[in-house]
Amino acid sequence: MSHVVRPILIILASVAIYTKYYLSFQNGFIDLLSTMGSQGSLAGLQDGLRSHYTGLDPLDKFLKACNVFFWPIFHGTSPALSLYAIAFAGSMIPMWLILLMHTCVKSSIVEIVMINALTGLLVQGIGPGVMMCVLLAMRSTSMEEFAVTSIPAVSILGPNDLPLSLVVCYILPLALSSLPAPASISVPSKQLFIASWQGWPLYIALAVGIAHSLRYGYRRSRPQQLFRHAYAFALACSIISHVGLLLISFLSIYPKSPFLSLHSADLHPQSLLVPRLPWQEVKITSLESGVLRFLHWDYSISSTGALLWCYDVYWEDRMRGKGWIAFFSLSSQLATMSLAFGPCSVALALYWTALSKNLMKNEHVRKR
């Protein structure tokens, strides 16, 4: 299937460029972002946009643009946008973990840190809709190298190091950025938190490197045990955020629902869960609607690409083991599970099924 999946991933990346960037120029979203940036305004505020962060002008301009874009998400001016962003943030954890685990086979700890810092920053800066598809298209779906007798460099880490690094370097900055301003923190401080969160892939990569250095000389963990904790944590985050999105969205349509309010139309499943098709594009009149449309396509394409690639990994592994797969039956089951628990949750489960089997082979070979 790899010869089919790789071109599809490239096509998906092209669709992401078209829907996220080209159409954003056409519908006025980019112009709206530029106008707010030049005026120094934020969604819901007439002014207060911070201009200085690091002292490096190109980086400060990028972080300033990030604050204009992410402010309505963290400020909560649109409950539907914030709710959808939470689901998207939860799905990023399994997507990042898939990239990390696939790098850890034969790489040294320095290579693991550098590769994941670079690829993570590209995903954060350009967007997972484009970069996840490109990065996965560049990676082999074969699991043969996971059954080698060498011990991965990251096996020196403790089983809770990866989940802890995700909490400290990804979830905690998200939580700090979500604090209400000016009720709990000042507007400039909130913008600083939002800007700081942009570097979470670098923080996680450095945390993994530091944890490896602190544990140098310790007894190595079983790779399967190391990744199992991270897998369970990432799966829980993804499922909880996706199920929460579904529950609130579908409950909003019932007359006696606690979520029935002025925002019920925005929370309706058709508005919140389904991206507007390209030929249904309308002029963007508010920053919140433009950001939600942007996230719709980013999440839909990146999660589809991750699911497709992990399906190929699972397929290749079963075929290599001379197994048999009922294609249509499995595909329908995966589609149903993706709707219920999230496509990234299903993608991670498929990847872990293939990975854990090959890590067990690795362990059995080394014990001989």
Swiss-Prot record:
Q: Which top EC class applies here?
A: isomerase
Q: Where is this protein found? A: Membrane
Protein's UniProt keywords contain Transmembrane:
yes
* Pathway where this protein functions: Secondary metabolite biosynthesis
Q: Does the keyword Transmembrane helix apply?
A: yes
Q: Which UniProt keywords apply?
A: Isomerase, Membrane, Transmembrane, Transmembrane helix
Give Gene Ontology CC terms: membrane
Please tell me where this protein is predominantly located.
membrane
Similarity comment: Belongs to the membrane-bound ascI terpene cyclase family.
Q: What is this protein called?
A: Terpene cyclase penA
